[in-house]
Regions:
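Structured alpha-helical bundle/scaffold domains in large eukaryotic membrane-trafficking regulators
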Residues: 19, 70-77, 93, 106-113, ...
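Solvent-exposed, non-transmembrane amphipathic alpha-helical segments
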Residues: 24, 40, 78, 98, ...
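C-terminal interaction modules of eukaryotic adaptor/scaffold proteins
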Residues: 114-174
Length: 174
């Protein structure tokens, strides 16, 4: 509850997209946050005419973020990532969300990430090993056992950096 209060900078009891974007370490991308507000239960503020999230919707978001390995969380995220509601994440969706991660990395670090969009898209498809090569279904995402990693790569610049630096971090002395 304290995190919710800290995020609620205008202290109106609701969170707007800009406030929610500061969740965690501030690595969430705006296209992902926009999808949260498009797909989850939100309210239109009469004063600002923008969508805002109440505490109940925030709790659903937090539970999904904290327990990304759970199938229920993957259902939550899949709904957000599936832009057209087709039940498939194709190259377009992967590129759309990862492009935003690359942009967020520039905002945070001031320099581009040392990777190519196509390489990461191919790596995600290799990780998931979808039953059909044209796209990733919810079942593929759950069954692959790395769905949480894929969600992080597509939604959060900090999660992508952690994934990208995983081998380096494994060899760091403590």
């Amino acid at each position: 509850y304290y995190t919710y209060l800290e995020l609620d900078q205008d202290q109106n009891g609701m969170l707007c997209a800009a406030e929610l974007a500061k969740y965690g370490e501030g690595g969430l991308t705006m296209p992902f946050v926009a999808r949260v507000f498009q797909e989850c239960n939100t309210f239109c503020s009469p004063a600002s005419q923008q969508l805002e999230m109440d505490y109940k919707s925030y709790l659903e978001f937090v539970l999904a973020m904290r327990y990304t390995q759970r199938p229920e969380a993957l259902v939550y995220f899949f709904r957000l990532l599936d832009l057209n509601g087709r039940g498939v994440l194709g190259a377009f969706e992967v590129n759309y969300f990862f492009r935003a991660v690359l942009e967020r990395l520039i905002e945070l670090d001031g320099e581009p990430a040392p990777c190519q969009l196509e390489d990461v898209k191919d790596e995600i498809f290799d990780m998931v090993k979808p039953a059909q090569p044209h796209g990733i279904t919810l079942a593929d995402l759950v069954d692959c056992k790395v769905g949480h990693t894929v969600v992080g790569i597509l939604t959060d610049a900090n999660a992508f950096l952690a994934y990208d630096r995983r081998e380096f971090n494994m060899h760091e002395p403590e």
